Amino acid sequence: MRATEARGLLSFIDASPSPYHACATAADMLGRAGFGMVEAGETWPEGGSQFLVRGGTLIAWAVPPEVEPGVGFRLVGAHTDSPNLRVRPNPEREQQGYRQLAIDVYGGALVNSWLDRDLGLSGRVALRPADGTTEPEVRLLRIDRSLLRVAQLAPHLDRQVRTEGLRLNPQTQVVPILGLAGQDQRGFRELLADELKVSAADILSWDLMLHDLQPGAFAGQAEEFLSTTRLDNLGSSYAVTRAMVRSAEGSTARPRISVICLFDHEEVGSTSANGAAGGLLPNVLERISLGLGWGRGDFLRAMSSSTLISADMAHAVNPNYQEYYEPGHLLHLNAGPAIKINAAQRYATDAIGEALFASVCAAASVPVQRYLGRADVPCGSTIGPLLAARLGVSTVDVGFSQLAMHSARELCGAADVGHMVNALTAFLTL
């Protein structure tokens, strides 16, 4: 099972170069498991297993038969976005005979890791509607050929790089090369039009980003690692979706409503219509309860007894940088998911949540670790505190560990994928 889940994660990530593709991949997994897709503006079926996609965000739920009014939700959240390089609205540049694309750095990307890589292009494109309305047609785009490259400066021309390290100005030094100028090549908009088989005049706007073309792979002497991209946080998104599929296939110890949420925009603060700080999830939860004929009091009772797991990747100890970690709470690859704890509530875990997840892992025969950062280093955060405050539900932050977080190429333990899937499945079913 562990090897199966590891291979499944590699396939999931390779199929998901952007948040929009990640939602499409997760939607396909759910659809094959019998979940039906609904639209926000339509009336939803009562009960059953459904999912909603809005941009780079997906929410899915499974309502068992004869669920009691006011029974709590079991929620698991993750995010679909990863730090990367994104294409600007007017991106075309010409310098010294080269055609280039201007980019923005999205999130806290380790920009140096994007240098000298074969880069493709992916995301979504908004097209002029064919029916004459104002609602654009949106299509996914994926170009999986070596289209772009950010070339590093040779050390012969920058002698200080060896002693002072690499420093990059993203405005001037992280501008991908698209081709040579002056060769009657079609413009960027025409390139997109050719890929989509539309007129360039019909392209209105885009949300496009660069992606590394190297596929994911098993790594290490015993193939105990996974080397891939976007582990933060497609590693968790895959585990969350697989847990939902597996829980829907089996029986639960007692009827409860299971909900998973894969949010966009976590890497830039979550304060968007599709982010965890927005109103999408509370609205979906209330609509589920209304569809079951619950009153407002039933819904509020359900929220008061609900529990949320925020699943986001964690920091495994890097043997080359041991001094950056809290020595009493080191995480190791293939040693199971970690419960994340922070006294300043940068993680939402409290003692009750910690005990709950530890009990779930024990029931599923999954090893568990604890993670805390150093007291003298500021702690990152997740969607956990945002959702805990927004929903008022008990929340625990967890995640399986990795190396090189926010790099264009990351590393995790192959066995940890199965550990995480098993733990989350147990949470949704026990």
Where does each model-flagged region fall?
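N-terminal hydrophobic/helix-forming segments and targeting peptides
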Residues: 1-430
